Amino acid sequence: PAVLPEIMRLFNQTAMEIYEGQQYDMDFEVRNNVTLEEYIDMIRLKTSVLIGCARKMGALIAGASEANAQALYETGLYLGLAFQLQDDVLDVWGDEATFGKAIGGDIMNNKKTFLLIGAMQKAQGDDANELRRWINNEYALRSEKVPAVTALYERLGMREAADEAIKRYDDMAFDALSRVEMSDEAREAFVQLIKGLVGRKK
């Protein structure tokens, strides 16, 4: 097919970006100065580009124009960002029975999420000292650490900050989707997919 070279180029580019994102994620484990901008870039590379790649490949194979294929790529990119941020939120405030795994795993592992990085940037005085104590306490009990750090997140407004970021990327995904020429039926299917992934509880 005529689109094969473009598909192979996109595949190779995406593979390299995912490797890069995974390396960033590993590097973040030993860094205490990770910024929210770096985190967003990491999840873009590790997660979002794969969703964008899948959408663009499908569009190209189906004979879509470059403009439509690129808009679908961007839809996937922003959807991936919103999806990962929602995952960060669910790990703290989700319902265990619905989420399908224990809540607070990221907190117990000091995983650099949108919530922890934002809290580290915003916390001052007693809040900063308390957050550092929990991060440095290797023997903290889940029953104590998770509620305490969750309370810190709430006090620092991190739930609201995450929800705002999710909505921003959700809106950007819909904006990109609005530029795609497709039937009303196909558009509605994409709309429901975006709503389902971003509004998920598990």
Give residue spans per PLM region.
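All-alpha prenyltransferase/terpene-synthase fold signal
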Residues: P1-K202
